[in-house]
Amino acid sequence: MHKIMAINAGSSSLKFQIFTMPGEEVLVKGLIERIGLPDAIFNMSFQNEKIKETRAINNHGEAVEILLEQLKTHQVINDLNEITGVGHRVAHGGEAFVSSCIVTDDVVKGIEDVTSLAPLHNPANIIGIKTFRELLPNAVSVAVFDTAFHQTIPEENFLYALPYELYEKHHIRKYGFHGTSHKYVAGKAAEVLKKPLEKLKIISCHLGNGASVCAIEAGKSVNTSMGFTPNAGLMMGTRSGTIDATIIPYLVDELGYSLDEVTHMMSSESGVLGVSGISSDFRDIEIAANEGNSRALLTLRMFTGQICNYIGAYASAMNGCDALLFTAGVGENSPLIRKMVTEQLSYLGVTCNVTKNNAGDMIISNDDEAVKVCIIPTNEELMIARDVEKYTKQTIS
């Protein structure tokens, strides 16, 4: 038995879990928020204890040092060498990384080379990797890429209709994201439905502040809604999703915006927040919609309509759908969103049992339906730990 840590470093946060492997038992989990501010928050829970502290944490390096200190102080671990592997979620691996890999200096450089494709995510991922490599030099560091699962998407689905040399020379193409989540829930759905993953056509809806839909056939991603960057596809909490590309030069040339302002607008001021004018959080939108707010209602119709457009397209492309999955914060916790989506898919044979949906059952379709509609809680940290486990076994052997 050994201990593996899964790390998800955000721009101002650090999410962590330690698993005992191979049993996959969660030893400790937590979240460090508001990194860089004087009132950063350290949360950690283990056994029956919960710790919450507010303190100044200036950067990710400090956050990691404090985390390792706290693990020893509370005797979650006695020696840092007990941690045999650390897995890092990395948002964008470009075409260079088709699977998870052991981190080397060359791997770090490769991640740095594609930072411009995920400017909000990759820099924090890199800081996390460098800090843990320095402080836990004996642990195997593994990079697990959000884009890797989508490397099986065929060329006709990942190419943009731009001059082909832009792909050949500059690798401009659809990459897709949330791959670790889509891969996990597809495998879990096969377990729940008691069917081989290789025999299933699955459409997975990862709906959170970031959102994407993925077509999965025989366990492999064949298409997904996000694109060259995580800004494409569905409207999201603050991201516009896919828009007519010529809107951008129009905003710059005709309305006087700078390119930086447009980029900020599309990533931080658009989507659910931009349309509703209320919030980027669907809980707030649902409350406002229930009170009759017209723009909140419009936001819900737009979001669920876009999801259904992708589901319809992917079901057509795969010539069917055996399972429709809802996961992530909104997908797992919003009966209203699930209801609004499934109501528009009756032509596919999709149903949503009201009682099961409101109760949050794992299978919410009627028992006799061919298309199974499931709520599958995602567990990206466990997928990361499993990938690390493979490499620690190889290293030890």
From Swiss-Prot:
Mg(2+) binds at residues 8, 380. The active site is at 146 (proton donor/acceptor). Substrate binds at residue 89. Pathway: Metabolic intermediate biosynthesis; acetyl-CoA biosynthesis; acetyl-CoA from acetate: step 1/2. One of its GO terms (biological process) is acetyl-CoA biosynthetic process. Mg(2+). Can also accept Mn(2+). It is an enzyme of class 2 (transferase). ATP binds at residues 15, 206-210, 281-283, 329-333. Its main location: cytoplasm. It comes from the Bacteria. The record marks 178, 239 as: Transition state stabilizer. It catalyses: acetate + ATP = acetyl phosphate + ADP. Its EC number is 2.7.2.1. Homodimer. HAMAP family: Acetate_kinase (MF_00020). This is Acetate kinase 2.
